[in-house]
UniProtKB/Swiss-Prot annotation:
CTP binds at residues 13, 148-150, 188-193, 224. Residues 292-534 form the Glutamine amidotransferase type-1 domain. Homotetramer. This is CTP synthase. CTPSs have evolved a hybrid strategy for distinguishing between UTP and CTP. The overlapping regions of the product feedback inhibitory and substrate sites recognize a common feature in both compounds, the triphosphate moiety. To differentiate isosteric substrate and product pyrimidine rings, an additional pocket far from the expected kinase/ligase catalytic site, specifically recognizes the cytosine and ribose portions of the product inhibitor. It comes from Prochlorococcus marinus (strain MIT 9313). Catalyzes the ATP-dependent amination of UTP to CTP with either L-glutamine or ammonia as the source of nitrogen. Regulates intracellular CTP levels through interactions with the four ribonucleotide triphosphates. The gene is pyrG. One of its GO terms (cellular component) is cytosol. ATP binds at residues 14-19, 71.
Amino acid sequence: MAKFVFVTGGVVSSIGKGIVAASLGRLLKSRGYSVSILKLDPYLNVDPGTMSPFQHGEVFVTEDGAETDLDLGHYERFTDTAMSRLNSVTTGSIYQAVINKERRGDYNGGTVQVIPHITGEIRERIHRVAANSGADVVITEIGGTVGDIESLPFLEAIREFRGDVGRNDLAYIHVTLLPFIGTSGELKTKPTQHSVKELRAIGIQPDVLVCRSDRPINEDLKSKIGGFCGVPNRAVITALDADSIYAVPISLEEEGLCLEMLDVLNLTDHDSDMKSWVELVHKLRNPGPAVKVALVGKYVQLNDAYLSVVEALRHACLTQDASLELSWVCAEQIETHGPENLLKGMDAVVVPGGFGNRGVDGKVAAIRWAREQRVPFLGLCLGMQCAVIEWARNQAGLTGASSSELEPDTNHPVIHLLPEQQDVVDLGGTMRLGVYPCRIAPDTLAQKLYGEQVVYERHRHRYEFNNSYRNLFIESGYTISGSSPDGRLVELIELKGHPFFTACQYHPEFLSRPGKPHPLFRGLIEAAQLRLPASPDEALRRQSQTNISAQEQPSRIG
């Protein structure tokens, strides 16, 4: 039978509940326990798929095609475990399910209320994750802050959950903030006390307090917090501000979070294997030479809009012993100031996904600059579509070529709507979503990077390369290096003779993991490193490779 952990937050929003949940998952998995993590979001949207990235950050896509909160990306990256649509629950989806049941008559004419019907549906979703995943421990993060009206049904549901499984099979973690007041020179505990008081009023007594702080918390302060909040001193965990989110599991392990959880849940403490994670953090703190990467996007004012892309770049840099020097470049600024002014000195360019025509001309200009200047380039989703448009306009002779999404009346719709999307009216959850196979063409950069004939990648799009232009693109020098198994959909393109120029219709960033970077991102960083001044050892290695390559070439004499 599964054990259950519930993570709540108090005092302020964005306090790091998701990272705490993901870190605990990592620590449990390091001891041999299987873990699944779900997020309960208190907003009324059914899912974040139709929300602006400025409102919500990126939309993370699961294997089964759910559009979810970005925290699910943290869960997957930290635990190296795939989540599903069951792991993302919103107030909107709960109410939708309950109302649908009422319309079908499932409640036999009864009055439908928040308690027990809404809270019962929430509890059912948590049980469903446990049954579907078969995990030893199910961790549930409750979005929002204790005291918010929107979160009350979720908090009531996790209070009721204690009656479902018994007190020995669940634990409550409350993440809170200890603010430092400079004038008094003290960390203040009163906000934490009041936050726990709010929880107790609902009927939840936390087992562990994870206290965010920018400085160490001494034992006297832990004793004070524990006494006022009703938890043992050892269960008051310091969560110091970290230089990287990947350092948080190590910090929480040193503070004893996992041991306390195992004790509360009556689980055996096995030997912990965090060696690879410790090595990863050591690399983060002792990076190699910096690689300058420009991320050219529409939503660069909010970094979370491209969270998985940035993490994938970091993973690749870690493996390649490089540090990431990321430049956030607004695509619209390129339209005004030109790519040569904003991208000069970059070692690589990434154009990620997005929607709408704002900034597209800037992305197209950035791609042309990377192509002509022979700067390594990686395009993702809309980034691939922009690469196709750039080639059509500047190399294939298709003046005015565009996407039918951006310019419905274009004479050359090199990107067009997928046939199965023709009659789709609703926006939410109706795109080509989730994992699909991609067949890799032999003797291509993609085949070299992947080392596989067929790969499986996550998608989120409505528009695709227009096969009416396929032969023209191939004849003009484009290489289609990946397509759907039936050959109908172009999934991956590249340019031969360029140091690194490739773009994909899918989202490889969702599959990148610390210590296991995605092949496309690793290839990009490896190509970018070749632009850096070589150390003496590296210069010898490159010369050796050049000599070997020369020896392998057939002789032109005789």
